[in-house]
Structures are given as C-alpha cells and as structure tokens.
C-alpha cells in the first residue's frame, strides 16, 4: 500500500511498515556528517533525487523488523548479492538494504511498498521544515510495539497536551525553523535538535489562513486524540480555526442615493443588470484577471488577493465589486486551465451577446451553413468593439434577465425558454436541408476541430467523428409505423446546444482543482430571483437594495470558501494527511454603531463541507431577497420559507432568521463574515535516539520542577539536564 509507513491515517488497518529513513534507500556515499554540532551543508533535493533513481532497486523496504537500527534483524539467511545479480534478484522480490533479505511480494502479504521520498517531501511541505530537518527527525507515525522507546508523556493524549502547552509550546514552536542549530532550537527545551513530535499540517494550516485577507485569525487550543487499533497506536492533533473580516455594505452611490428613486426605478434596475452582466461575462474584457503577474523578481504575485481589501467596501469599489469570485478563481489555475477557462468564458460571453445584440450591419454575422462557424461566432461576439453597439439598458429587463440566466447556466439545460437572438445567421444552400438540421449533423465534427485548434494538449486524442451521411444514400424501407420525429428546434436552441457540448468537452480537459463550479454558480440563484420578482411586480427600492447587498456578500463568501477549499482539500499533500471535520460560516449584520442587527450561521460536516456551505449560503441569501419589504412572516408562510432556504438543525436561531427577513436593510452598515473550520492531522514521532534522549531528560526535569511547585525554565534558557 503506497504511503503506508510514514503517515498512515487511522482508517488504514494494514500498516506494517514502521521505520523510515532516507538511509534505507540511498547509498551511504550520499550522506555526510549529520552531527548537529558540526557545520555541514544540508542535503540538497537534487542529491536526494539522484540517489533515489540511482537506488531504484531498493525503493521497496522489507517490513520484517529490519527497517531501523533499533529493530531486530531478519531471521532469514542473508544471500550474497553482487551488483550484477541485483536486478535479477530484485526482479524476484524486494531487497532489504539493512540485511540483504529478499522477500517475495507475491507470497508475503506483510510487504508494503513505500515511495519514501514522496512522504518525506509531504512532511516537509506540511510542516514548513526542510528535507534535511525531516531526515534528522526520522519521523514515524505508528508507534505500536515501540512505545517503550519514548517517555509516557510523549505517547498519550493527556501527556502530549501537557508537553505541548507547558514545555514545548507547540502552537508557536511548529511555526519556526526547527533545523538543528537554528536559533529556535537553542537551549530549553530542544538543545539544538528538533522537537520529539511534528504536527503534520498545522504549520500549513496557519500559513494558509495568514496568506488571505482576514482581519482577525484565532486558533483554539491544540487537542490530541489517541488511536488504538490492531497493530496500531497513533496520535492525532485537532484545532479549530476562526478567521473573519468585515465588509462595508453601506450605500451603493451609483443608484441607492438617487433622490427620485421611484421615478427612476426602471433605469436603476437596468443599470444594475447591465453592470452585473458585464462583470459576470467579461463583456468588455474577457481576459481580465487571467494569467499570472511577476513583479520585481517575485513570480506569480496574487494581485487579486492583494487588491481584495479594495473590494471590502461596497460604497468605494462600486461596480468593480462584481466578478470578484471569478477573478480570484483564475489565480489558482495552471497554463492549460487558463486556456480552457478563458475559452469557456468567451463562449458564454458570445452566447449572451448573440442574444442581446441588435441586428444591424455592425453586429450581424452571416456565414454559410456548411462552415465551421463556432470559432467565428466566438471571435465576433467577444470583440470589444461590439460594446459600442450594445443596447442592454434599452432592452426589457425581463429579456436581459432571461438571457443572462441562460448564458450563466451553460452547459446546463436552458432554464428560460423560448430564446431569441438576431445578430447571427447561417445561410442555407440551394435545395439543401434545413439550416438547423445541417447544424445538428455537423455539430460533433465542428466542436472537435474547434477544441483541437486551441493552444493546449488534450488529455486523450478522440477518434474523429463519422462524416455526415451522404445525401445520395438509398432511402430506407418505409416502416408501417415510422418513429415520431423529434420536435423541431429553433435556430437559437441549436446554437446553444452546440455551445453546451463544446463547454462540456472543455470541462473534461480541466484539472480537478479547476472544476470547482459549485463556488461560482451562485449568480444563477440571484438572477432567477430578479426574474420572479419582476413577474410578480415586486421590484422596488427594498428588493433592489437587498439584492445588491446579498450579491456582494455572496461574492465574498464564494471567494473565501473557494480559497480554503483549494488550499485545504485540493492541495494533494494536505488532502492526503489532513482531514476537514467541520466548516461553518457566520454572518453578522451590524448597524452604524457596531451593534449586531442579526446573525446567521451555516454548518456543514465532512470533506465537502466548503462546497456544501456555498450551495446553502447562496440559496439562502437569494431566497431572502424575495421577502424584502414584506414584513414579518406569517405562521403559514414560515414553514414554506424554511423549506426554501433548506434550513438545517443547529444552523442558528430561527428568531435570527426571521429578524433577517423582516429587517429594513438601510439599518445594515457592515457585514462581519467569520469562517470557522476544524481540521485534524497526524502527529509523527522522532526515531532519532538523541532527540528521544533529550526529550526524556527534559520531561524528567519538568516533572521534578512541577512536583516542587517551581516554574519551568524560560524558552532558550541554558539549564543542566538530569542524566
């Protein structure tokens, strides 16, 4: 089982590989003096990689007790192996470098393959330490049958909690450079060596929270739990992180402060939709926010993250607030994902422009029906010059809303029908079949050629689609009851179906981390609300104000949850060893004096908690928009509203929800967004005898001072340890 020796999680029940060291897999010539008192260079990663490939035959380690110097040797006879026979012998099994023991993997179920270097790098990445520090530390996860090598305080949850809080202060120590001879290791309690434990993932968690634009960050006290299973004894650490920041949801001056709001309501609604549409589909600049930025030698500077403070104040950032989540999303994309996401965004933009552009000589695109029209369609309707002829604000808002919902829901089915557009046409051939029929027959071939022309390498080359059926084929025999023909589809529906299929195939090419559509689909909920409100004739100042405010909040929630999901669940080393147990979003609305007007809480459990939270928050906020200005809920309305927002138990007080629904949003000046999440990771123990000895003496002195009611030495103080 790969990765089973060093970091096996509690749910793994077949772990037998206990010891670990790069000395198990690299020749001795790759190692120099590693005495902390000596001044020697660190073992470079290139050297480790070179040794790894040079010693490929010993990448599999025998687990019969000969994986470390402390374990007893194998009882099997040691065959004489020469360099020339190494490959032959290795082909029949796995070679233990400690004893030369050859174990046949086919007959020995106790053999676990371990790509040691991968686990070493995972440990280094998640603890923030260097590979050299990890090599000196020599981590081990499962201490079954080796407990006697450690002090009792090091191997129990109660003892480790005491050591962590009073002796080593792990909550701070794990954030430092723990390499031998570094300043953090001088004096009490480390004495020039790393600590006896490493909390794998803790430093990475703190770094992830620190790299974001939170105003406050707090962490609960570290808790430790013991895991006792057959042939396993392990420890885990758990911490609750609480990170928050405040956004100013005050007056949106572009329209809220109009003196004659009621008289200009239609223009206000059109302005909101036009601004939001431009942001959602990058109508003017489809490439805005894409790619990486390098500044003064710093590579891949997260510009959108650095600028996000600007987006915390709605009255200042104005229309620049729109599209925040999508702009942040692209910062995590690789080169291939950037090409794909850009193309998908352009296809959605082109489809929307096709629906809303007026039919005139400047906007019309006329092509023969037998051409590969998709590329020309995308280029034409994403051309920035097209914005000069846009008349979105003069169109009926219901039409604009339908168009934006249809475009944003791609590649899903069209929620709004019928669709109509007039700026694109395909000219039929003389005496040929219908245009829509020709489009349908040539769809597969056109999409494949469209994707093949993109500047990227596809995952797998697909077989070319069969050519269109020849018109000269003999007519089939007429059946007595011919099958019913499919309903006739409009030209606009055929255009949308083509774009749907193209986007679907493009999404298959995305990496897993770039497929997180669940964080960026919240806009559809809000546009559907606007559509329903207009049908009911309930568009007014209160609904528009709440729609803008909650859309702004949803942008921030989506951006933050996507960041946390990407770093804590999609980053491979973290997802392998660190578990997400609980996630929570708390929204507190405050007035001008800072008093809480209402608060909302959303909870989710499990590995997918972040994405599930986004779905609940967006649906909840969108549903609440419809209740703006309607006052308190009646008894018969309450049950239906709770169903609309998918209310869960332990998700806040119901009275707070009712207060949120009935409040006048002019009282809300700011929103405090708190993101809480509970994570659990593995504790690894050191196999270094010197570290174990120092820890034993440190614990003995600390216990003695505690019994005498004397204070422990200060950090880095030079003290004499007992023998």
Swiss-Prot record:
GO cellular component: a single term: host cell nuclear matrix
A GO BP annotation: viral DNA strand displacement replication
Pfam families reported for this sequence: Adeno_terminal
Residues flagged as site, Priming of strand displacement replication by covalently linking the first nucleotide of the new DNA chain: 651
Protein keywords: Covalent protein-DNA linkage, DNA replication, DNA-binding, Host nucleus, Phosphoprotein, Viral DNA replication
Modified residues (O-(5'-phospho-DNA)-serine): 651
Record's comment on post-translational modification: Preterminal protein is used to replicate viral genome, upon genomic encapsidation it is processed first into iTP and finally into TP by adenovirus protease.
Superkingdom of the organism of origin: Viruses
Subcellular location: Host nucleus matrix
Example of a GO MF term: double-stranded DNA binding
Annotated site location: Cleavage: 290-291, 422-423
Chain ranges for the short sequence motif Nuclear localization signal as given in the UniProt record: 453-462
Chain intervals for the UniProt region annotation (Disordered): 457-492
HAMAP family the UniProt entry points to: ADV_TERM (MF_04061)
Function summary: Protein covalently bound to the viral DNA that acts as a primer for viral genomic replication by DNA strand displacement. Assembles on the viral origin of replication in an initiation complex with viral polymerase, DBP, host NFIA and host POU2F1/OCT1. The terminal protein stimulates the template activity over 20 fold compared to protein-free templates. Neo-synthesized viral genomes are linked to two preterminal proteins, one for each 5' end.
Subunit and interaction comment: Heterodimer with the polymerase; this heterodimer binds to bp 9 to 18 of the genome. Interacts with host POU2F1; POU2F1 binds to the auxiliary sequences in the inverted terminal repeats and tethers the pTP-POL heterodimer to the origin DNA thereby participating in the assembly of the pre-initiation complex (POL-TP-DBP-NFIA-POU2F1).
Family to which the UniProt record says this protein belongs: Belongs to the adenoviridae terminal protein family.
Name recorded for this polypeptide: Preterminal protein
Annotated source species: Canine adenovirus serotype 1 (strain RI261) (CAdV-1)
Lineage: Viruses, Varidnaviria, Bamfordvirae, Preplasmiviricota, Tectiliviricetes
């Amino acid at each position: 089982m790969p990765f089973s020796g060093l970091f096996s999680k509690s749910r793994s029940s077949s772990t037998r590989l206990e010891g670990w060291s790069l000395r198990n897999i690299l020749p001795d010539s790759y190692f120099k003096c590693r005495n902390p008192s000596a001044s020697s260079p660190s073992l470079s990663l290139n050297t480790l990689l070179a040794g790894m490939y040079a010693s490929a035959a010993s990448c599999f380690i025998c687990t019969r007790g000969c994986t470390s110097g402390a374990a007893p040797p194998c009882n099997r006879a040691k065959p004489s192996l020469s360099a020339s026979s190494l490959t032959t012998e290795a082909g029949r099994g796995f070679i233990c470098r400690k004893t030369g023991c050859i174990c046949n993997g086919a007959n020995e179920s106790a053999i676990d393959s371990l790509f040691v270097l991968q686990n070493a790098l995972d440990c280094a990445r998640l603890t923030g330490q260097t590979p050299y520090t990890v090599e000196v530390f020599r981590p081990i996860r499962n201490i079954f049958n080796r407990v006697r090598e450690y002090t009792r305080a090091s191997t129990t949850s109660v003892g480790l909690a005491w050591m962590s809080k009073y002796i080593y202060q792990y909550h701070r120590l794990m954030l430092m450079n723990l390499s031998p001879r570094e300043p953090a290791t001088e004096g009490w309690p480390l004495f020039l060596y790393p600590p006896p434990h490493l909390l794998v993932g803790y430093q990475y968690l703190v770094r992830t929270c620190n790299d974001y634009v939170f105003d406050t960050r707090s962490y609960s006290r570290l808790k430790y739990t013991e895991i006792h299973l057959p042939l396993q004894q392990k420890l885990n650490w758990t911490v609750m992180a609480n990170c928050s920041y405040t956004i100013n949801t005050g007056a949106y001056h572009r329209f809220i402060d109009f003196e004659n709001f009621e008289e200009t309501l239609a223009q206000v609604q059109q302005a909101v939709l036009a601004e939001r549409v431009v942001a959602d589909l990058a109508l003017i600049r489809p490439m805005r926010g894409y790619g990486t930025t390098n500044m003064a030698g710093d590579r891949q500077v997260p510009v959108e993250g650095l600028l996000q403070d600007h987006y915390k104040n709605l009255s200042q950032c104005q229309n620049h607030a729109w599209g925040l989540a999508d702009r942040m999303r692209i910062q995590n994309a690789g080169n291939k994902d950037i090409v794909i996401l850009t193309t998908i965004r352009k296809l959605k933009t082109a489809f929307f422009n096709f629906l809303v552009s007026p039919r005139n000589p400047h906007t019309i695109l006329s092509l023969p029906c037998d051409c590969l029209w998709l590329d020309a369609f995308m280029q034409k309707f994403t051309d920035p010059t097209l914005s000069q002829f846009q008349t979105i604000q003069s169109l009926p808002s219901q039409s604009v809303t339908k168009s934006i919902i249809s475009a944003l829901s791609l590649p899903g089915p069209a929620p709004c029908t019928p669709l109509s557009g007039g700026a694109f046409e395909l000219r039929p051939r003389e005496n040929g079949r219908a245009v829509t029929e020709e489009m349908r027959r040539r769809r597969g071939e056109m999409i494949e050629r469209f994707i093949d022309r993109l500047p990227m390498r596809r995952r797998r080359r697909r077989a070319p689609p069969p050519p269109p059926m020849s018109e000269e084929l003999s007519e089939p025999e007429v059946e007595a009851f011919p099958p019913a023909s499919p309903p006739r589809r409009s030209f606009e529906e055929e255009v949308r179906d083509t774009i749907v299929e193209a986007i679907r195939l493009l999404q298959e090419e995305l990496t897993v981390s770039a497929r997180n559509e669940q964080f960026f689909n919240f806009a559809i909920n809000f546009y559907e609300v606007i559509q329903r409100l207009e049908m009911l004739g309930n568009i007014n100042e209160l609904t528009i104000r709440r729609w803008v405010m909650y859309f702004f909040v949803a942008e921030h929630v989506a951006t933050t949850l996507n960041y946390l999901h990407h770093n804590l669940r999609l980053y491979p080393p973290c997802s392998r060893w660190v578990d997400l147990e609980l996630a929570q979003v708390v929204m507190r609305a405050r007035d001008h004096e800072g008093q809480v007007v209402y608060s909302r809480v959303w909870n989710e459990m499990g590995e997918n908690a972040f994405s599930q939270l986004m779905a609940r928050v967006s649906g909840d906020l969108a549903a609440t928009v419809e209740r703006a200005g309607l006052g308190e809920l009646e008894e018969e309305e309450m049950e239906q509203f709770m169903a609309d927002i998918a209310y869960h138990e332990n998700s806040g007080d119901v009275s707070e929800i009712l207060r949120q629904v009935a409040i006048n949003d002019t009282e809300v000046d700011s929103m405090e967004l708190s993101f809480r999440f509970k994570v659990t990771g593995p504790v690894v123990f050191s196999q270094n005898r010197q570290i174990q000895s120092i820890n034993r003496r440190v614990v003995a002195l600390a216990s003695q001072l505690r019994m005498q009611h004397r204070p422990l030495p200060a950090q880095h103080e030079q003290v004499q340890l007992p023998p």
